[in-house]
């Protein structure tokens, strides 16, 4: 069994002001995405300036934050937020849903593309390889917060999370780290390598949706579902799996359509 590193969720306190690691992870993810996007900008569109890229990253970040929070409220704990709406603003305590953030990003990309002469999938293909940076950083934030841990296990790398998070004090799968490895590192490598060669429009987006959906669906088998939801069917189906299944099917559909519709191969290497 591995010891859980006792990390204070508050990274820095200045008087009454507290800066949480969870929030810093979002900043690291956004900064990392901007850095990679700036390195690939000329291959995407030589006419775009760094200022326009910064505008894109800003609106996508707003989509992630607003969509992620509203997605958690709607998909995972709507009754609690109806009873106490002020909880919606306590984002430092966690409670963000990737699938809601993904919808927020799609809306922001569609809106920004319309204003800047880019199609929805041109922007999504450009953005997709950057997303795992934010996903990986977010999972580290979950780990520091000692939230979203896995089921009890006797594997050598099991961890006992703090009593405030897990009163049962059982050795558990560190599922946040599994998701960091799959949704962060592995997905980044897949998309980075895949997007280095010219691909038809929608192909990179399809790869993102397919592999994120697969990775999330698999990890859900060892991750404890949110207590207020539990398992939704057959004693093992979780909300995360239900929301990931359309991504898997959608990713397959996008890849099939990208490579089978009648169009020339476009030089969209990123």
Curated annotation (Swiss-Prot):
Its EC number is 2.5.1.145. One of its GO terms (cellular component) is plasma membrane. It is found in: Cell inner membrane. This is Phosphatidylglycerol--prolipoprotein diacylglyceryl transferase. GO terms for biological process: lipoprotein biosynthetic process. The keyword Cell inner membrane applies. It is a multi-pass membrane protein. It comes from the Bacteria. Keywords: Cell inner membrane, Cell membrane, Membrane, Transferase, Transmembrane, Transmembrane helix. Pathway: Protein modification; lipoprotein biosynthesis (diacylglyceryl transfer). NCBIfam families: lgt. The keyword Iron does not apply. Its main location: membrane. It holds the Pfam family LGT. The chain crosses the membrane at residues 10-30, 56-76, 92-112, 120-140, 174-194, 202-222, 236-256. GO terms for molecular function: phosphatidylglycerol-prolipoprotein diacylglyceryl transferase activity. InterPro entries: Lgt. A 1,2-diacyl-sn-glycero-3-phospho-(1'-sn-glycerol) binds at residue 139.
């Amino acid at each position: 069994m591995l010891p859980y590193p006792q990390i204070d969720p508050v990274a820095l306190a200045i008087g009454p002001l507290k800066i949480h690691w969870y929030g810093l992870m979002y900043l690291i993810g956004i900064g990392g995405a901007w850095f990679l996007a700036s390195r690939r900008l000329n291959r995407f569109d030589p006419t775009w300036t760094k200022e326009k890229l910064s505008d894109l990253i800003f609106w996508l970040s707003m989509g992630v934050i607003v969509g992620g929070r509203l997605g958690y409220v709607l998909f995972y704990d709507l009754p609690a937020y109806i009873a106490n709406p002020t909880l919606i603003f306590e984002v430092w305590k966690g409670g963000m849903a990737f699938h809601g953030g993904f919808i927020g990003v799609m809306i922001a990309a569609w809106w920004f593309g319309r204003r800047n002469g880019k199609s929805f999938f041109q922007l999504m293909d450009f953005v997709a390889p950057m997303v795992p940076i934010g996903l990986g950083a977010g999972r580290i934030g979950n780990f520091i917060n000692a939230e979203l841990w896995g089921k009890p296990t006797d594997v050598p790398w099991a961890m006992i999370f703090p009593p405030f998070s897990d009163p049962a004090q059982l050795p558990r799968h560190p599922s946040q780290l599994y998701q960091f490895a799959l949704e962060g590192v592995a997905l980044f490598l897949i998309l980075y390598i895949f997007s280095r060669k010219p691909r038809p429009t929608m192909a990179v987006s399809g790869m993102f949706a397919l592999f994120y959906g697969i990775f999330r669906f698999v990890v859900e088998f060892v991750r404890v579902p949110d207590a207020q939801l539990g398992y939704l069917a057959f004693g093992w189906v979780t909300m995360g799996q239900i929301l990931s299944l359309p991504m898997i099917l959608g990713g397959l559909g996008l890849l099939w359509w990208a490579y089978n519709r009648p169009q020339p191969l476009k030089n969209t290497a990123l």
